[in-house]
């Protein structure tokens, strides 16, 4: 392979990180492992900052985002089937899109690698599932009541 034509090309420019080894005072270091502490950035630059109150608010917001995402995931709007109504389809699409967006926001918050954010995200999803997805607070439908009265199947397809 002929590489003679490459001698006219300028050398690659050094990256900004190799040009200086110092960081500016307003930039925070991004963690690549889990860490404990309130001094973090979650979702937005400078939020929650270094304030304990703002960190607590951040944890509450992440918890609520996870609970709402679970509520939307188990919403009756998403379970409507057999309808060919376009309005119902648009409503399902809107709810699904909102749920997916909230889930991605929670995922991005967890990517801050702050252990507190991780714990409240998992707790939010767990509480959301317990309240809206588990059978704890659901009334069984008529089909479920009938199925509970029948003896368990033996697995035989005779």
Swiss-Prot record:
One of its GO terms (molecular function) is high-affinity copper ion transmembrane transporter activity. GO terms for biological process: copper ion import across plasma membrane. Residues 1-20 are annotated as: Disordered. Signal peptide: none annotated. It holds the Pfam family Ctr. Induction: By copper deficiency. Down-regulated by treatment with high concentrations of copper. Highly expressed in leaves and at lower levels in roots, stems and flowers. This is Copper transporter 2. It is found in: Membrane. The chain crosses the membrane at residues 53-73, 104-124. It is a multi-pass membrane protein. It comes from Arabidopsis thaliana. Belongs to the copper transporter (Ctr) (TC 1.A.56) family. SLC31A subfamily. Involved in the transport of copper.
């Amino acid at each position: 392979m002929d590489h003679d034509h490459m001698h006219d090309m300028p050398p690659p420019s050094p990256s900004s990180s190799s040009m200086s080894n110092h960081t500016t005072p307003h930039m925070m270091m991004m963690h690549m492992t889990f860490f404990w502490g309130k001094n973090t950035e979650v979702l937005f630059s400078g939020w929650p900052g270094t304030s304990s109150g703002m960190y607590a608010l951040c944890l509450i917001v992440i918890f609520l985002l996870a609970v709402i995402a679970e509520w939307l995931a188990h919403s009756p709007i998403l379970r409507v089937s057999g309808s060919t109504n376009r309005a119902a389809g648009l409503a399902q699409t809107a709810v699904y899109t909102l749920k997916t967006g909230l889930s991605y926001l929670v995922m991005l918050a967890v990517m801050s690698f702050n252990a507190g954010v991780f714990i409240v995200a998992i707790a939010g999803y767990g509480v959301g599932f317990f309240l809206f997805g588990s059978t704890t607070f659901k009334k069984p439908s008529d089909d479920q009541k009938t199925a509970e009265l029948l003896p368990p199947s033996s697995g035989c397809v005779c």
